[in-house]
């Protein structure tokens, strides 16, 4: 057999093996418990990554904003924290008093130290220590809510007003939102002369 024939056979064998492994892997159905575990793992990773950002920004730059018409660094992160809790509350049907931008009952029978009103506009929450507290707490609450939701209910439809989707979709939207706003702050950190944290993909 010629060298080229051997090479072709080896290539065919490799492709067949890869296809077989792919088919075998794709045949493994993921369970609701596995999805929940992945949600928790990703939220824990996201918390660590966001804390990297918060720690990287100098305390005296938390009020920095690239242009006057947008949120400061502190406000971006406080908005992230507020919506971490809000969207996950929607996902699990936890009692919500009103739409974001107005007053929200953060306590709801729990001992959560949130200021009244919309968090990012709280004058007492803008310092580095306060922002880190609220952001860190928001991730803990999100993880708590996810752990408390039976994966068998992921397909149920829920929402607020006319905005309806599955619980699973709301959980995805909550994660997407915090990723978006953390990403927006990358340029804030660069503009004050600090190197942003490296990605935490795993």
Regions found by a protein language model. Give the residues of each.
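Solvent-exposed, charged/polar functional surfaces in cytosolic regulatory/catalytic domains
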Residues: 49-52, 56, 141-145, 184
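Short, low-complexity N-terminal intrinsically disordered segments enriched in polar/charged residues
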Residues: 29-40
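Surface-exposed helix-capping loop/turn segments at secondary-structure junctions
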Residues: 56-63, 144-155, 191-196
